[in-house]
Amino acid sequence: MADTAELAIVHATTASASWLTDPTVFAANRKPAHSSHRYVIGETREPKQSLDGEWKVRIEQARNVDVESAPFAAVDFEDGDFGAIEVPGHLQMAGYLKNKYVNIQYPWDGHEDPQAPNIPENNHVAIYRRRFALDAQLARTLENDGTVSLTFHGAATAIYVWLDGTFVGYGEDGFTPSEFDVTEALRNGNGNAADSPEAEHTLTVACYEYSSASWLEDQDFWRLHGLFRTVELAAQPHTHVETVQLEADYTAADTAGTADTAELNAALTLRNPADAMTIESTLRDGDGNVVWESTQACNGEIALNSGKMTNIAPWSAESPTLYTLTVRVVGHDGAIIETVTQKIGFRTFRIENGIMTINGKRIVFKGADRHEFDAKRGRAITREDMLSDVVFCKRHNINAIRTSHYPNQEYWYDLCDEYGLYLIDETNMETHGTWVANNVERPEDGIPGSRPEWEGACVDRINSMMRRDYNHPSVLIWSLGNESSAGEVFRAMYRHAHTIDPNRPVHYEGSVHMREFEDVTDIESRMYAHADEIERYLNDGSPAHTDGPKKPYISCEYMHAMGNSCGNMDEYTALERYPMYQGGFIWDFIDQAIETKLPDGTTRMCYGGDFGDRPSDYEFSGDGLLFADRTPSPKAQEVKQLYANVKIAVSVDEARITNDNLFVSTGDYRFVLRILADGKPVWSTTRRFDVAAGESASFEVDWPVDDYRSNAEELVLEVSQQLGNACDWAPAGYELAFGQCVVAGAKTTADAVDAAGAPADGTVTLGRWNAGVRGQGREALFSRTQGGMVSYTFGEREFVLRRPSITTFRPLTDNDRGAGHAFERAAWAVAGKYARCVDCAIANRGENAVEATYTYELAIPQRTKVTVRYVADTAGLVSLDVEYPGEKNGDLPTIPAFGIEWALPVEYANLRFYGAGPEETYADRRHAKLGVWSTTAGDDCAPYLLPQETGNHEDVRWAEITDDSGHGVRVKRGAGAKPFAMSLLPYSSTMLEEALHQDELPKPRHMFLRLLAAQMGVGGDDSWMSPVHEQYQLPADQPLSLNVQLKLF
């Protein structure tokens, strides 16, 4: 298949409906792709005019729209019955089309069965119309023999464009600019713009829901359409810098005594260069100081070269230093015709000896895949959204983003340059549904494969992306697309990419499905490979090369963050010890949920299927580290600690600091050292630990543990890495990472129930139906017939609505459902819930205490017996022991959770606990800080799209559940017992299990306290197949024991 240096674009004076189903026609009259450099006319005149704002729109069926005669594009067309829509925006979000979410399958599947490149008959067209007057600045440029272009920065899926009734052009690939020259249309349209800049013009767009391009855009996202990015006019002077291509290389010194050097090479393409005399170029640092300048004669192709420069600070995510190149085009009369500015970061990114390096250092991507999404605006996100996302990344130690699976808005790249994020820039292409059906893969059937009719469109897509984004230092890797199998078309794309850019690596994961096309990627990239599978590659190589790895490895998607997920992430970060392991990208960044107002005025975060869209993949759109409203999910806590560049190991006599930064020492951070006595801070100091990048060092710490040991059950020694100074994304003192160790104290773990030590003025009553213990204003009542403690009061306050019941299950997580957990462990869903009490033994324990022991049979065929034992004394202390002996008989599945669930009055909604936090933790997601944390039952119920298991806290020593007046119950681990797991939620496990949306959960009428001996992990390898890892499961043949002390206050 032949490559073309530049893509051939159809030129036409009238529109053709045939283009919609012709993959060889992907644009008509579109200008060649070019860099997104900034420019002004002269020195200050802004060249652009925004056409954003309110447009008119009407939806038609495609069969009723004739784009060739296009009567709707006439200036005098009657559009009084059109509706209003904001641009940028989506037709679906504005209510004009139905929201549709599918993952792999195409949205028309089952309704129609078109064969590519054909499209469904049920195809909508949005006729957009907008009237505008040309800004005076742009009219002046036209008057001076300049040009004006019209750019659609994002439009889905295909657009036909008319200006004043004149056909302007056609465009696909909605995620890169469709730019059209409208100079003549403006001059010849409704009024002469040069003479009458206030003349009104009429812009008409026919935006199609489906075209042949739809086959290339089968990404896992909401299928949203319309003009969803900025629409603008831009004027260009007669002599104009059309494109800029920069190489800003940085070379680190390789021998002692030599200097680091940087060199700038820039290629500028000028239109009408004969009308200019000179090019003046200036490079300035962030303080405005000139570091290089030149003046040279003007011709068509301008080559700038700075030569070797010293004292240039390199760009990296750790230290994103930017310089500004200013280029002035000077006319023969000495006047400045145009001024171009471009931010520059000097850096070199290469694959050296099989390892990706930046500025000579091995890089590890601590990344996430990011869809552009907002719950209210869809993919029409704002600058504020983008800045919020960048700040989240920096605060959570995320250093890289893959623009999955399309080029992002241009401003995103500016932010990543400025704040420091590495990017894999991905071509707008996914054809997953063409080669996967009913979970059966047929990669040879994939589009585009080796079909020559698709080559032009696919090569054009990567060409448009690369030309636009080339100059951004944050872009380290080009990606050919996502989940589109492989074939000769990808070889053409790969060759074209390296023709434009021989330096950056090219990435593509799809070749793993067709190993004969391994040559289309410079990186071994896989999705959802388990850690052990990755390790095999790092040791042995790929199936095609079993003599060791030949390419650096990344997981372009891993840690499927759907719902309550991201367990066992540490198994992946542990692979960083292999030089050719270079990190991964968590799928994905933000939940794709649409905030929808319900008839009763409330709102719901809706997922697939909620709009009557079928087929649908329902809640599979909820895979984010952020919830759809951009609040961090509890999973982010784990990611932040595991992605930290500074690792801290604490012991009783030192702190060991490992600095995994590549370029930045730890000298500018402050390290706060604390001692916590049973979670309470009792000692603190601040130290400076200066460790060079890539190095480790141990620092002696004289912890005054002996001063606090006698009055504590345990001490926590903590070192916190914090920002020493405020920066653009966080204040001074913001914590980036921490390390802790636990030292035993001298106090006993808990006050055991002691009949001899209990007050003698209390009473113990052994009745025929109940046994009661009363003292110090507290009373506990144990039923002989109802299987447990049926009352626990302090004064007039009752804390037991129903006796605490055995639980052996948990609400299913998304990962549980995907791995078949419900089917495999269905027995445990009812084993505890429907357990029956088969024995009760109540007796005095001394004079001032009572012991009540209940034996339950679990509702499983083995009828395994579980013991629930209470010991209560007249001091108001209740000891609770719940024992599962382990069941050797039969092949029982592992247990989801084991302990008790206890319904409390609704007012007891506040939780304060000493354990791992502050966010929820699980057996395989517990890289959290040990401390005392405060929250509420409502706040602890994470708003996962599909209600599920949530709110668990591991390693809990004690917890206090209180009302707003401070009254409540304290739960503490028993004497000699291990820490327990617990949660306090406004909903029972059954309620969470049954609801399909958060708003379907009932108004809280009780609080549900769950005390657990243990709970299985949540998993995270994927959400459709992989179970929780064995070491984080609870084998049914092993005993489990919960031992806690209760006291009301």
Swiss-Prot record:
This is Beta-galactosidase BgaC. PROSITE patterns: GLYCOSYL_HYDROL_F2_1. Its EC number is 3.2.1.23. Optimum temperature is 37 degrees Celsius with ONPG as substrate. Retains 60% of its activity between 20 and 45 degrees Celsius. It catalyses: Hydrolysis of terminal non-reducing beta-D-galactose residues in beta-D-galactosides. SMART domains: Bgal_small_N (SM01038). It comes from the Bacteria. Activity is inhibited by EDTA. Activity is abolished by Cu(2+) and shows 59% reduction in the presence of Mn(2+). Lactose acts as a competitive inhibitor. It comes from Bifidobacterium adolescentis (strain ATCC 15703 / DSM 20083 / NCTC 11814 / E194a). InterPro entries: B-gal_small/dom_5, Bact_Beta-galactosidase, Beta-gal/glucu_dom_sf, Gal_mutarotase_sf_dom, Galactose-bd-like_sf, GH-type_carb-bd, Glyco_hydro_2, Glyco_hydro_2_cat. Optimum pH is 7.0 with ONPG as substrate. Retains 60% of its activity between pH 6.0 and 8.0. Mg(2+) binds at E430, H432, E483. Possesses the industrially desirable properties of high substrate affinity for lactose and low product inhibition by galactose, and is an ideal candidate for dairy industry applications and prebiotic manufacture. Signal peptide: none annotated. One of its GO terms (biological process) is lactose catabolic process. PANTHER family: BETA-GALACTOSIDASE. Gene3D superfamilies: 2.70.98.10, Galactose-binding domain-like (2.60.120.260), Glycosidases (3.20.20.80), Immunoglobulins (2.60.40.10). The active site is at E483, E557. Catalyzes efficient hydrolysis of lactose. Also exhibits transglycosylation activity to produce oligosaccharides at low concentrations of glucose. In vitro, acts on the synthetic chromogenic substrate ortho-nitrophenyl-beta-D-galactopyranoside (ONPG). Acts exclusively on terminal beta-linked Gal residues. Keywords: Glycosidase, Hydrolase, Magnesium, Metal-binding. Its cofactor is Mg(2+).
